Amino acid sequence: VGTRLPSVRELQQRYQVSPLTVQHVVRDLAAKGLVTVRPGSGTFVAAAPPRGPRPADLAWQHAALGGRTPQDMTRHLALLEAPHPDTIRMSGGYLDDSLIPEKALVASMTRAMRRTGVWGRAPVEGTAAARQWFARQSGGFDPAEVLITSGGQIALSIAIRALTRPGDAIVLETPTYPGYTAIARGHGLDIHPVPTDRDGLRTDLLEDVLRARVARLVVVQPLYANPTGGVLAPDRRRELLDLARRHGVFVLEDDYARDLSIGGAQPPTLASQDQHGHVVYVRSITKPVAPAVRLAALAARGPALARLRAAKTLEDFYVSGPLQEAAVDFLSSPAWQRHRRTVSRELGLRRDGLLAALRSRLPGVEVAHVPAGGMHLWARLPEGYDDADVAARALAAGVMVSAGSTWFTAEPEGAYLRLTYGETPVAQLVEGARRLASVL
């Protein structure tokens, strides 16, 4: 400490470098606190920096947290991670930036921010305008029966937790969105899977489950189910509502994809056909509008509404007023309908482009059902393949896909991949199929 370094000239001659290089090195050493420069005197070795605090010992948390981990969401959350820039994404659940109506959203947000009183605390139930819009879309609820939430995920969590108690039985489709499984297991529920096909939930098998045990809640995606793209058939809709009435269970309708139609007539919401308050309805605008617009509605009738409102107050409190105002401004404008047409057209092009590429390059991969909406193809791998292994090797080859086993509530009935076309242009989807073919 305190030793004087040789002069710049000496260092230059000793190491055969330029004076500029020596100056850069000295400046870097000084920035790190290793040397001290004293003008007119020279450069000296600095005193050893004080030792920092000892590294934190976080091992105690393992004992405090216990052995339970949210395994059900681990692989699913990995799909939300940003891959390498050169990786083609065929695994996510949102539209890509090219399909976000940015200019219209900015205009709506600008108008919303200028409104008087918008920066105050919004009502717990949501603004009147937002509740009215979602009530009209639901087809079965009054605005007073609608609660606005910060996105669809929190709405689903509130509904499942509020309508059940730990230890209760809950019926989930299989395959289905793994977020339901994670919520149910986190709440200590007893999960009973019921298979689906292209016509939605197998109500004949649901009847067997409900006859054998008391369940409180059945969770369904009647329209463009994730991941299969199936639509609940008219006869099964009637049977589901009849089973709910006879067995006294709630039905949670996750209507996440109504604004992601590619073509053809859509059935009405299940809630619109429910007379006795069995259906609890969730509708989000995040997927069709933009990932940053985290806004959804949760609707119910009777005592269930009061239970949901109390749970929402604890878990979600109130939603940003400017966000609600901006969303309603956009959804009530001609820009929204133009955007829906654009999304429908582009999703159709992407779906068909990916299907053609799969049939050309991967004839052994079977897509049994071509969805009329949503963002995903449910593709069965040939016998002998492991979906998790294929997904891992595909990622190494530069294409990110989702292993089908992530989506099964029970044992997988085969090896599948969920291939997303909503977040990737056609040319990249074709290249993604080529990369996937290289690992099969």
Task: Give the positions of each predicted feature.
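N-terminal basic, amphipathic alpha-helical segments
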Residues: 1-110, 309, 313-319, 331, ...
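Short beta-strand
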Residues: 36-38, 366-372
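Conserved core of the PLP fold type I
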Residues: 116-247, 259-276
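Hydrophobic residues in well-ordered beta-strands that form the structural core
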Residues: 172, 193, 251-253, 327, ...
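PLP-dependent aminotransferase class I/II
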Residues: 279-360, 367-369
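AMP-binding (ANL) adenylation modules
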Residues: 406-412
